[in-house]
Amino acid sequence: MGSNTDWSSNFAAAAVSAMIAYDDILVPRLFNPFADVLVDGVAVSPGLKVLDVACGPGTVSRLVAPRLGPEGSVTACDLSPAMLEVAAGKPALEGAAPITYRQCPADELDVPDGAFDIALCQQGLQFFPDRLGALAEMRRALKPGGRAGVAVWCAIEENPFWDALATAVGWILGKEAEIGYRSGPWGLPEADELARLFEVAEFSDVDVRRHALPAVFEGGPAQLVATLSAASVGPQVAALDAAGRAALLAAADAALAPLVHDGEVRSEAATHIVVAVR
């Protein structure tokens, strides 16, 4: 229960409503700011062809497309139909590169060999059952000299708001659920291990750096509890009755209390960003 596999399967099977909650809460507060850092790291310029692996609701794709201009292109891949539906339903970006969405797993990308100048992946690698296979696919898709940029969360302890939320999950749903929750997005936290994976996948000039940004949730602990619908514990949270949900909200209030100021959760988020060359 609640393993990294459960995170992946819940993403793949989640309803569109769960993905909308993810998009509304986490994307503007975390994924957009970190996508800026990720894209800056690979030196994007107009006219390039970009691959976005595990594109989710189109966060990185929509950020990079205006930088590429109409002469560039973005191909965005994800396993989750719900994520792709949310992404494809967003309005077109004026003066930006066109974005094409494709449903496929990261270790079997539906793209041609050597077609892309840049391959990006924000917070997907840690979920892939075959991480080396996914990196090999990204390398296959890149032109010689093409650049890969991959973001992977640091340890959950370096993301205090998620650490506290995991504690609340354990109090209400049990230790096994907490362990599974903690194993997901934060399941590949070591910079050395990240570098080794890229080197084994035959990338060169591998550079791993830690980046931290403020994380503010204006809606308080309840706003973070709402993100659990897209997590490994999503089905368990959905099955709670009114009393159970009230208990979960109370647990989140207690666990997150040290981070709450004027009703807002104010913390920090930290990720590793890897840049490497094919």
Outline where the language-model segments fall.
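A short acidic, Gly/Pro-enriched loop at the edge of an enzyme's catalytic core
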Residues: 107-118
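Conserved hydrophobic residues forming the short capping helix/wall of the S-adenosyl-L-methionine
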Residues: 68, 91, 169, 198, ...
